[in-house]
Amino acid sequence: MVNHKKIVLVLGNGFDLDLGRKTSYRNFAESTFWPFKGEKNGLGGYLDSHKKKEKWFDLENLLREYASSDKKIVPFVRNIQIDEPAFYRLKNSLMDFIKKEEVIKLNEESIAVYLLKQLCPTFDTASALKVYSFNYTDLNKVFNYLNIREGLRVDCEYIHGTLQNNSIILGIDEKVNCYPKYEIFIKTMQPTYESHPILKDLFFADEIIFFGMSFGDIDYPYFQIFFKDRCDENKYYEEFNRKRIAIFTRDVQSGQNIKLQLMEMNERRLMQMYNFNELKFFYTEDGITDELKDYLNDIWHNDTK
């Protein structure tokens, strides 16, 4: 049996968290790798002060606020000569922190592991599985750890760089009106930023799986055009245009947050997205359900072409 489906798997930090890695920005801020403990001034002081008072510590959003010329940061004073080296120190410390988490024992009972094992085809591997990771960790190390890499043809691109060559991309989106010289915080301005055909692959995929993505303000520009297209009633009538889209997230509340982000991206046409596609949400806290088993089994045993 040969399956000709095109499958795209998009991984966010929730994927690493489900594997058992403590890689959230909150974990980083509370670790011994945090570089700004006790600092009172500049970028370091600004970030450290918010670490103490915010339950949800969104590092990149805080960088966004700090760099924005529209945002007052009283009592902190911007000074690029101090903040630029602090920014690079932040990136280096984050890399050291994640390298430590990358080598821990994985939770083999997790939904993330179950998904990877089920996506390994048990028949002719003619189907194309393309992976896009927004994480800094090496997916090949996960495959090797689980002994499922051999014979599996996986093409993985790392949107924000990897730890392997110290090329991680940390920063903000380009819509921010930056304070002079703070454009260095913008992801696309960083020298290691590269092009990726993620939008093209999403458009041509039959099956799309998002795992651990929050679709927050920093990253949703990657997907906004795609999700708008998925709600276009004119496209719905085109042959073979219906897509199966699965979103894996932790629980119902995080699912609700994602739906709000989707409505923000597609002009509040979430109903059309459900109607014009086969959209499913899976919650990792529910474990391995019959619905999840049926969904993954259907990927490999129902050819769309």
What are these regions (language model features)?
Residues L19-F33:
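Active-site neighborhood of HAD-like aspartate-dependent phosphohydrolases
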Residues K37-F204:
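Extended, H/D-rich, highly charged conserved domains that either
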Residues F33-K37, P180-I186, E233-Y236, M273:
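Glycine-rich loops and low-complexity Gly/Arg-rich segments
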Residues M1-V2, E30-P35, E39:
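Short hydrophobic membrane-inserting helices
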Residues F15, Y25-F28, F134-Y136, Y222:
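Aromatic side chains
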